[in-house]
From Swiss-Prot:
Keywords: ATP-binding, Chaperone, Cytoplasm, Nucleotide-binding. Residues 527-546 are annotated as: Disordered. GO terms for cellular component: chaperonin-containing T-complex; cytoskeleton; cytosol. It comes from Schizosaccharomyces pombe (strain 972 / ATCC 24843) (Fission yeast). Heterooligomeric complex of about 850 to 900 kDa that forms two stacked rings, 12 to 16 nm in diameter. The gene is cct8. Pfam families: Cpn60_TCP1 (PF00118). It is found in: Cytoplasm. GO terms for biological process: protein folding. Belongs to the TCP-1 chaperonin family. PROSITE patterns: TCP1_1, TCP1_2. This is Probable T-complex protein 1 subunit theta. The keyword Nucleotide-binding applies. The keyword Hydrolase does not apply.
C-alpha cells in the first residue's frame, strides 16, 4: 500500500490571519476586476467633456477636478494590483504631464479583453505574449502615423499647437487663453539650449477674485504678501537671504536682575539695541538693500531695518526660499550676520503692486530671458484655481516631451482608431494562437473615441461606425470625434488643430501594457493580516512638499 503524505496547506505554513488567493479565477480575474473598477471611476473624466469628481481625502482636503492623476492619488487605493495602475499613472503625470487618464482607461480595457480571452480558454501567458507582440507593432505604427512636428519650441505659435489639446482636456473652453498664457511663460524662461529647460522655473500664484481672463504672466517671482517693514520698493539691489529668524540669540539659562534706580532700568536694554543696530549697519554697509527671511522678524530688528531703508520680506516656504535663491543668485545663511560678497544675490526691481484687492511683492528681472516666470491666476473659488493650476502644470510638462521628441500625432481619437484598424489587420495576418490577443489589443484602442463620444453625449456606436468607415478610406487617418457635434459627430483633427504629443502617447501605451503584463503574470496573492493598534498619524497638511 502506497504511503500518502498530506500536503501542507497555507494555514499550516503561515501565521493566523494570512489570506492566500491562487489560480486564474482568484488571482488573475480578481485583479482584473479591481483595476477595471478603478478605470470606470476615471473613464467619465476622459476628454474635453470629462466630468469633474469631488474627492475628500483622509486629511479632509477637498479636490474638485477631472485630472485622473489627482483623483486616484487622493483615493488611497489599497488593492495591490490597482496600486500598480496608480504608480504607472503618477509616473506618466510626473514625466510628461499628459495622457495620465489614458493609462488608467487603456489598462482597464486591456484587462477586460484579457478576462474574456481567459474565459474562452486562453492562458494568461499566451495573452501576455500576444500583448507583447502587439506592443512592438503599436510602436512601429505610431512612427508611421506621425502627423506633424514642432519646428522650434522658441515659437509661441508652435508651442500653442502642442499645449492646446493637453489643456483642453482639463479646461475645455478656456484652452486658447490658458495655452497662450503657458506659452508666454515658457518663452520667458526658455534657455538658449531648450534641452536644459526646467519646469520649476515656472510657478503659479493663485489670487482669488476677478475672472480667469485677468490672469497674467510676470517676469520674476511673485509672493502673495507684503514686505514686513515700511520700505516697499527697491531698484538694482543686493539681496541677502536668511533661513533663520531675524533676531538675536537668547541664552538658555534664566537669570534675575536687580535694578537699583531708573537709570539702570534705562540702560538695561541698551546693550541689546546697540548690538542689533551694529548688525543691521554692517549689513547696510555691505551694500544689502533687500533682506529675505524664512522666520519671524523681531520688532527691534524691523525698527532698525526701516531706519536704514532696507526692504525685508518673509518667505515661510523652504521650497520658495530655495527657488528665490536660484533667481537672485544668493546663498541662504543659517544665522543673522553680514553675508560675504559671493553669498549675496542681486535683483533688478523689488516692488509691491496691487492685484485685485490683494497686495503682492514682485521680484522682477528686466532682461528678456529671466530665470523664473510667475503665472498669476485669478478665479472665483479656491478649488477652481487649484484645477487651473493642475492644467497649467500639465501644459508646462509637455515641453519636456517636446524637447526630446518634437513629433505630433492626430488627436480627438483619430490616432487611436488608426491603431485599432492597423493592429486588427496585423492580427489577422499573424498565424497561431497569438492572433486573438493582438486583435483584442487593437480593439482596446476603440475605448478612447468611444469614451470621448459618450462623455460628449453622442451615440458612441454611431460615431464609432462612422470612424471605421472614414479610416478605411484614403486620407481618412485624421478623422476624429467632434465633441460639439456640428456635423455627423466626426471632424478632421488636422483642420481643427487637435494634436497629441507622440512621446506622451508612446509612454502611456507602454506603461499601460507593462502594467497589464505584470498583472497577467501573477498566479498567487499572499496578504498578511494588517497590524493592530492605532494608525500612524498622517502628514501635516501645513508642511511644505519638501
Amino acid at each position: 500500500m502506497a504511503l500518502r503524505v498530506p500536503k501542507a496547506s497555507g494555514p499550516q505554513l503561515f501565521r493566523e490571519g494570512y489570506r492566500i488567493m491562487q489560480g486564474v479565477e482568484d488571482a488573475v480575474i480578481r485583479n482584473c476586476n479591481a483595476i477595471r473598477e478603478l478605470s470606470e471611476i476615471t473613464r467619465t473624466s476622459l476628454g474635453p467633456n470629462g466630468k469633474n469628481k469631488i474627492v475628500v481625502n483622509h486629511l479632509q482636503q477637498t479636490f474638485l477636478t477631472n485630472d485622473a492623476a489627482t483623483i486616484i492619488r487622493e483615493l488611497e487605493v489599497i488593492h495591490p494590483a490597482a496600486k500598480l495602475v496608480v504608480d504607472a499613472t503618477q509616473q506618466q503625470e510626473n514625466e510628461l504631464g499628459d495622457a495620465a487618464n489614458f493609462v488608467v482607461v487603456f489598462t482597464g480595457e486591456l484587462l477586460a479583453k484579457a478576462e474574456n480571452m481567459i474565459r474562452m480558454g486562453l492562458t494568461p501567458l499566451e495573452i501576455a505574449k500576444g500583448y507583447e507582440m502587439a506592443l512592438s507593432h503599436t510602436m512601429e505604427v505610431l512612427e508611421e502615423i506621425c502627423a506633424d512636428k514642432i519646428e522650434t519650441v522658441e515659437s509661441e505659435k508652435e508651442l500653442i499647437k502642442a499645449i492646446r489639446t493637453c489643456i483642453s482636456s482639463k479646461q475645455y473652453g478656456n484652452e486658447d487663453f490658458l495655452s497662450d498664457l503657458v506659452a508666454k511663460a515658457i518663452l520667458t524662461v526658455l534657455p538658449k539650449d531648450p534641452s536644459k529647460f526646467n519646469v520649476d522655473n515656472i510657478r503659479v500664484v493663485k489670487i482669488m477674485g476677478s475672472s480667469l481672463y485677468n490672469s497674467q504672466v510676470v517676469k520674476g517671482m511673485v509672493f502673495p504678501r507684503e514686505p514686513e517693514g515700511t520700505v516697499t520698493r527697491s531698484k538694482e539691489a543686493k539681496v541677502a537671504v536668511f533661513s533663520c529668524p531675524l533676531d538675536i540669540s537668547q541664552t538658555e539659562t534664566k537669570g534675575t536682575v536687580l535694578l537699583h534706580n531708573a537709570q539702570e532700568m534705562l540702560d538695561f536694554s541698551k546693550g541689546e539695541e546697540n548690538l542689533i543696530e551694529s548688525h543691521i549697519k554692517e549689513i547696510y554697509d555691505a551694500g544689502v538693500r533687500v533682506v529675505v527671511t524664512s522666520g519671524n522678524v523681531n520688532d527691534l530688528v524691523l525698527h532698525y531695518l526701516n531706519r536704514f531703508e532696507i526692504l525685508v520680506i518673509r518667505v515661510p516656504s523652504k521650497f520658495e526660499l530655495r527657488r528665490l535663491c536660484r533667481v537672485v543668485g544668493a546663498t541662504p545663511l543659517a544665522r543673522m550676520g553680514v553675508p560675504m560678497p559671493e553669498e549675496m544675490g542681486s535683483v533688478d526691481v523689488v516692488e509691491t503692486i496691487e492685484i485685485g484687492g490683494d497686495r503682492v511683492t514682485v521680484f522682477r528681472q528686466v532682461e528678456d530671458i529671466t530665470r523664473t516666470a510667475t503665472i498669476v491666476l485669478r478665479g472665483a473659488t479656491k478649488t477652481y484655481l487649484d484645477d487651473l493650476e493642475r492644467a497649467i502644470d500639465d501644459g508646462v510638462n509637455i515641453v519636456k516631451a517636446l524637447v526630446k521628441d518634437n513629433r505630433l500625432i492626430f488627436g480627438a481619437g483619430a490616432s487611436d482608431m488608426q491603431l485599432c484598424i492597423r493592429l486588427i489587420s496585423v492580427g489577422e495576418k499573424t498565424p497561431g494562437i497569438y492572433q486573438h490577443a493582438i486583435k483584442q489589443y487593437g480593439e482596446a484602442f476603440e475605448v478612447v473615441p468611444r469614451t470621448i463620444s459618450e462623455n460628449a453625449g453622442l451615440d458612441p456606436t454611431d460615431v464609432i461606425s462612422k470612424l471605421y468607415a472614414a479610416h478605411h478610406k484614403e486620407n481618412g487617418e485624421s478623422i476624429g470625434v467632434d465633441v460639439e457635434c456640428e456635423n455627423d459627430g466626426t471632424l478632421d483633427a488636422k483642420e481643427a488643430g487637435i494634436f497629441d504629443v507622440l512621446l506622451a502617447k508612446k509612454s502611456a501605451i507602454r506603461l499601460a501594457t507593462e502594467t497589464v503584463l505584470t498583472v497577467l503574470n501573477v498566479d498567487q496573492v499572499v496578504m498578511s493580516k494588517p497590524a493592530g493598534g492605532p494608525k500612524p498619524p498622517g502628514p501635516n497638511p501645513h508642511w511644505d512638499d519638501d
